[in-house]
Amino acid sequence: MTIDEMMSAIKGMTVIELSELVKALEKEFGVSAAVAVAAPAAGGAAVAAAAEEEKTEFNVILKDVGANKINVIKAVRELTSLGLKEAKDMVEAAPKAVKENVSKEEADAAKKALEAAGATIEIK
């Protein structure tokens, strides 16, 4: 069997079959499929920067309300579908996460809307 044939066979397997294959390989060869954790080398900063670029989920943090609290509350209500009291409590509790684990596009849109209302926003 060639490598290409093995790859084709593996591609056709279900997740359960792949899991069983990994377990069988671990048992047969006495190895572990766990990822080894190593300390970053001198280029660790570059690796950290690359990992930061690959981030897919972001949190929109309300840092400061600014002078126009009412507009910020309205913007929070539109973005989160919260009631008036919940949105007011969130705004008054700043710094506070307004949206969590959202896409880059959604985080940018939320930041734009909240900054237009007068708030200071941070995306993490």
Curated annotation (Swiss-Prot):
Membrane-crossing residue ranges in chain numbering: none
Family annotation (SUPFAM superfamilies): ClpS-like, Ribosomal protein L7/12, oligomerisation (N-terminal) domain
A biological-process GO annotation: translation
InterPro entries in alphabetical order: Ribosomal_bL12, Ribosomal_bL12_C, Ribosomal_bL12_C/ClpS-like, Ribosomal_bL12_oligo, Ribosomal_bL12_oligo_N_sf
Key words, A-Z: Ribonucleoprotein, Ribosomal protein
GO cellular component terms listed in the entry, alphabetical order: cytosolic large ribosomal subunit
Gene3D superfamilies reported in the protein's UniProt record: 3.30.1390.10, Single helix bin (1.20.5.710)
Any one Gene Ontology molecular-function term assigned to this protein's record: mRNA binding
Origin superkingdom: Bacteria
Role summary: Forms part of the ribosomal stalk which helps the ribosome interact with GTP-bound translation factors. Is thus essential for accurate translation.
Family note: Belongs to the bacterial ribosomal protein bL12 family.
Record's subunit section: Homodimer. Part of the ribosomal stalk of the 50S ribosomal subunit. Forms a multimeric L10(L12)X complex, where L10 forms an elongated spine to which 2 to 4 L12 dimers bind in a sequential fashion. Binds GTP-bound translation factors.
HAMAP family: Ribosomal_bL12
Protein's name according to its UniProt entry: Large ribosomal subunit protein bL12
Annotated organism of origin: Dehalococcoides mccartyi (strain ATCC BAA-2266 / KCTC 15142 / 195) (Dehalococcoides ethenogenes (strain 195))
Gene that this polypeptide is encoded by: rplL
